[in-house]
A protein has these predicted regions:
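Short beta-strand element of the alpha/beta-hydrolase
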Residues: 58-67
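Short beta-strand/loop motif that positions the catalytic acidic residue
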Residues: 209, 214-217, 221
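N-terminal cap/lid segment of alpha/beta-hydrolase-fold proteins
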Residues: 22-56
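Conserved alpha/beta-hydrolase "acid-adjacent" motif
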Residues: 222-228
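C-terminal catalytic histidine-bearing segment of alpha/beta-hydrolase fold enzymes
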Residues: 48-50, 230-278
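Catalytic nucleophile-loop/oxyanion-hole region of alpha/beta-hydrolase
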Residues: 74-76, 80-83, 94-130, 258-266
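Mobile cap/lid helix-loop segments that gate and shape the active-site cleft of serine hydrolases
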Residues: 32, 170-205
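Primarily recognizes the serine-hydrolase "nucleophile elbow" in alpha/beta-hydrolase
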Residues: 114-179, 197
């Protein structure tokens, strides 16, 4: 009976029918021009806002950074498809179409920070509590999310973080090489590259003010070594930052919201429990 209740709850949580899906509101992230210009003039930063019913709103919001190795974005299963789940919990979801770095990390970083600031600027209208704005990221988007969580301050700093199979380090021994090269570029001196690798190895940037974290990954991930997530969790633990890590025995990389992931419902249930824990 208990198992049946759990299964029923999970099905209700993850139902994403067109009837209940909230229509997103697309916004230009930089209507007055971006702080950092991209070499790709066609690459425009945008965000899509999915708001829960006002009667259901908890005041929470999650700013979502899809993955794609800093070359493209998996906007659906690592972005828009999460809207119904979060809205059903009374949480706003903001999916960010951030620009690619082409060797300049501040391009995606500034886009993600701008998204968080925009959410806080619209907090009253959108029924959001400015102190309950989190960031979520997948793969390279997990690197971007953890960069914001460990580097950003003031109105750009998130209150919690959710990371799926994240790239965390830029250490060549266990980073994701594509993300490393696309983010940092490849034409630096050895000394400058070492500095950049250290600055953007987010496990090295954790301190006691880093926001609480939920981390989920598969043990058999061949694209981004699971050691990335382990290393980040270890540093959060050492600095007394509340964190929850969930390691699934299989699934590889890039499952996002796909129900074909064998542990999809378990992952959803565990994340819901974590969100309810604070």
């Amino acid at each position: 009976m208990k198992a049946l209740k759990v299964i029923t709850t999970l099905l209700l949580l993850t139902s994403a029918t067109a009837t209940h899906a909230q229509k997103g509101m697309k916004m230009d992230l930089w209507p007055n021009g971006a702080t950092y210009n991209s070499t790709d003039k066609e690459d425009k930063a945008e965000m899509t806002v999915y708001l829960p019913d006002a009667k259901k709103a908890t005041g929470r919001a999650v700013v979502c950074c899809p993955g794609g190795g800093y070359t493209h974005l998996a906007m659906d299963h690592e972005g828009h498809q999460w809207a119904t789940f979060f809205n059903n919990q009374g949480i706003a979801l903001i999916v960010v179409k951030y620009r690619m770095p082409h060797g300049n990390p501040m391009i995606p970083v500034s886009d993600a920070e701008q998204a968080i600031k925009t959410v806080r600027r619209n907090a009253v209208e959108w029924h959001i509590d400015r102190t309950k704005v989190g960031i979520m990221g997948f793969s390279a988007g997990g690197h971007l999310a953890s960069t914001i969580a460990t580097h950003s301050t003031g109105d750009a700093a998130p209150n919690f973080q959710i990371l799926f199979y994240p790239v965390i380090t830029m250490d060549p021994s266990f980073t994701h090489k594509g993300s490393h090269d696309n983010l940092l570029g490849t034409d630096h001196s050895k000394k400058e590259m070492k500095r950049l690798e250290s600055d953007y190895s987010n496990d090295l940037q954790v301190n006691r003010t880093t926001p609480r974290a939920f981390i989920a990954l598969s043990d058999d991930d061949k694209a981004v070594p699971a050691a990335n997530g382990f290393s980040y969790y270890e540093q959060l633990y050492k600095h007394d930052v509340p964190a929850s890590i969930h390691i699934y025995p299989s699934g590889g990389h890039g499952w996002g919201y796909r129900e074909s992931f064998a542990y999809h419902y378990q992952m959803i249930f565990e994340m819901k429990g974590w969100l309810e824990s604070f």
